Curated annotation (Swiss-Prot):
One function term, GO molecular function aspect: tRNA binding
Any single GO CC term annotated in Swiss-Prot or TrEMBL for this entry: ribonuclease P complex
HAMAP family linked: RNase_P
Protein name: Ribonuclease P protein component
Quaternary structure annotation from Swiss-Prot or TrEMBL: Consists of a catalytic RNA component (M1 or rnpB) and a protein subunit.
Function field: RNaseP catalyzes the removal of the 5'-leader sequence from pre-tRNA to produce the mature 5'-terminus. It can also cleave other RNA substrates such as 4.5S RNA. The protein component plays an auxiliary but essential role in vivo by binding to the 5'-leader sequence and broadening the substrate specificity of the ribozyme.
Gene source species: Shewanella amazonensis (strain ATCC BAA-1098 / SB2B)
PANTHER family, alphabetized: RIBONUCLEASE P PROTEIN COMPONENT (PTHR33992:SF1)
EC number: 3.1.26.5
Length: 118
């Protein structure tokens, strides 16, 4: 049975892990969200989220965005290659409802997979 949990091993935790992604990333982006990714040595993808206060003012809105992105990653983790992924959120994300945001992030996961799998 395939596990769809979102454990600590599936997250980027330290500044060094984030910095490794920022040095030489492959990008997949839309107007509201950018994904930066680099291959990792793990056997699974890992994700880190940045939702700046400057772009998304209220804490409950930042939490909503992060929750939707984490849930989307959790459901697509087995479709993604072994990558370290940083999700950058821009201002326009506040205009999206949860289903629209989920659909957008799903599309970006597929785009990123195609770039690494050929």
């Amino acid at each position: 049975m395939t596990s769809y949990t979102f454990t600590r091993e599936l997250r980027l935790l330290t500044p060094a892990q984030f910095q490794a992604v920022f040095t030489n990333p492959v990008k997949a982006s839309s107007a509201e969200i950018t994904l930066l990714a680099t291959p990792n040595t793990q056997e699974h993808p890992r994700v880190g989220l940045t939702v700046p206060k400057k772009q998304v003012k209220r804490a409950h809105d930042r939490n909503r965005v992060k929750r939707v992105i984490r849930e989307s990653f959790r459901m697509h983790q087995h479709d993604l290659p072994s990558l370290d992924i940083v999700v950058l959120v821009r201002k326009g994300v506040m205009d999206l409802e949860n289903p629209e945001l989920h659909k957008l992030v799903d599309k970006l996961w597929r785009k990123l997979s195609r770039r690494f799998n050929g």
